[in-house]
Amino acid sequence: MNTRPQFRPVLWILALALVLTACQTETAGDEEAAEADAPTETASVESETIAWDYTGETGPANWAELNETYEACAGSRQSPIDLVADDEAQDVNVEFDYTEAEGTLFDTGHGVQVNIEGGTLRIDGKAFALKQFHFHTPSEHTVDGTSYPAEVHLVHASDDGELAVLGIFYEEGEANDFLAPVWEDLESRATMAAADPLMMNAADMLPADRTTYTYPGSLTTPPCSEIVRWHVMQEPLTMSAEQMEALTAIYDDNNRPVQPLNDREIDRVTL
């Protein structure tokens, strides 16, 4: 699987608007409707909001039937997936150009998100601007069938409407210094709404090992648009038990089940 996946140019302005407005949202401003949450991964429609959830009649199994704008949720290039790549990691031209910027804690209605526009991810010379990062517990992607307690998605968008999402797993261990200031306002959804902006640099979130699984996929929340270049890092980071409990106390089980790989290939690359 050394052939890098080819991505079709996508100009889905609606999908991008939904993603950038809130990659997953039940109301204008809700988060996790997609991996393009810019400022979230949530889907938010100003004129009409279609409720979706992670369980019951509005859960993942029925997303594609809730509204015609969600039909892509039944597509053939959906995310998340189980990550399995046996080949040796290949080098790819990716540049991280993150800068210190103001991050704002945001309650999407489906998860914890931080809206931040602080830098650029360049893939083969193409620029993707950082828009936000948000959390799923437990992880959405799995590795050889194994899940992690949490996963963060850093959502980036290009000028032509394509998304690049960087996924990082978390396991329980030492306290995470980068997340500590953010977690001070995670006592409840009310404290999230009243939180003051924080200065942060997304570069401080990245693990030392830049080996990633990469594949073409979609937003993991409605509208599930298939416009995402996924890069999921192989090395997990840690959170303390207290940090993990604070996160899951507000939102837990906000993960879409893994989707069929179909005819896609998963590459393992070093960034």
Predicted regions and their residues:
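Alpha-carbonic anhydrase
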Residues: 4-7, 12, 23-271
